[in-house]
Every structure is written in C-alpha cells, then in structure tokens.
C-alpha cells in the first residue's frame, strides 16, 4: 500500500501548487501530507510539505507537529525533524558520500558510501534557504542555520550558525 502512496505523491501530489497559494495551496498541501502520513514513520499534525520535496521511500522519516519542509528540499530516509521546525526552500540533507581513499581507482568508480547515521533537527529550529546538512549530525533545539550554510558538525541548542563550514555566529540568548 505504501508503494501506491509513493506513486501518488511523486506522480501527482508533488507537482501541485505550492502551499503559499491561497485555497488551492492549502488543498495541495493537504494531499501531500495525506500521502506522507501513509509513507513516513511519523508525520505530525499541522505539517507542511511543499512542492517538489524529495524523500526517497520515506520509510524512516519522522516529522513533528507544526513543522514544514520548503519547496525543492531533499530529505533522506534517516531524518528526524522535531516540532515547530521551519525548513526553507532547497535545503539538502545529505545521506551519502563518495569513497575517495584509493587513489589508484578514479573516484567515479569507487562506490558511493551509504551512511546510516541519522540526522536530527531539534524542536523550534529554522533552516535557511539552500543550506546543506551533512550526514549524522544533530541540530540542537532552537537553533538557526543561516541561508547557504554547510553544516559539518553538531549544532548546539539555541545557536545561530552560518558559513561554509557553518560556524557559530552567536547565541539566540543575546551577545
């Protein structure tokens, strides 16, 4: 049955108008969330899944209440998104990496390395547009990831990070 909902999602629902559009956007989001509730491990109440979100087979994805995934995001199978998370468009959460240690073999012939390290985004986080989260990291509760950042390590709770690689800018509690 899950395969049927994947077919409906990728063949139809993902192409519907964005959730930001009045009336038709809400209906489109409702269809996408309807499919996600039958695909994901957990899909909370009042969630937003915007158009063209790619999540593979989605079987291990968890998304909490009042959270949203922006347009054109990539969310791999081993991702946990907690409550009240805002994910801007084109965020990529990476699950794979290329092997490159053997210099006698071209990198393109060294198999991609599937990681089973989960990525967790804590409650009340904001992930800026076009950010990249590398595998196996935790974004602490209340954190903000600046637009275009590349997160290569865990982010402490209530920390604003930015850059490539992302570095702490300041705490949300003041300077």
Describe the predicted segments one by one.
Residues 1-45, 84, 98-103, 111, ...:
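Terminal amphipathic alpha-helical/low-complexity segments used for targeting or macromolecular assembly
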Residues 26, 53-63, 68-138, 164-165, ...:
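Flexible, glycine/small-residue-enriched loop-and-beta-strand segment within the central core
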Residues 136-169:
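C-terminal/domain-terminus segments
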């Amino acid at each position: 049955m899950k395969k049927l909902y994947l077919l409906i999602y990728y063949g139809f629902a993902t192409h519907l108008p964005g959730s930001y559009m009045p009336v038709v956007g809400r209906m489109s989001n409702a269809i996408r969330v309807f499919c996600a509730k039958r695909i994901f491990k957990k899909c909370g109440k009042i969630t937003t899944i915007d158009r063209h979100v790619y999540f593979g087979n989605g079987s291990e994805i968890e998304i909490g209440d009042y959270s949203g995934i922006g347009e054109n995001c990539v969310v791999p199978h081993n991702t946990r998104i907690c409550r009240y998370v805002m994910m801007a468009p084109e965020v990529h959460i990476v699950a794979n990496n290329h092997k490159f240690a053997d210099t006698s073999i071209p990198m393109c012939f060294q198999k991609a390395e599937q990681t089973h390290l989960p990525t967790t985004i804590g409650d009340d986080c904001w992930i800026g547009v076009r950010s990249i989260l590398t595998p196996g990291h935790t974004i602490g509760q209340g954190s903000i990831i600046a637009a275009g950042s590349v997160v290569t390590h865990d982010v402490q709770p209530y920390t604003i990070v930015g850059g490539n690689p992302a570095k702490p800018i300041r705490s949300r509690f003041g300077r």
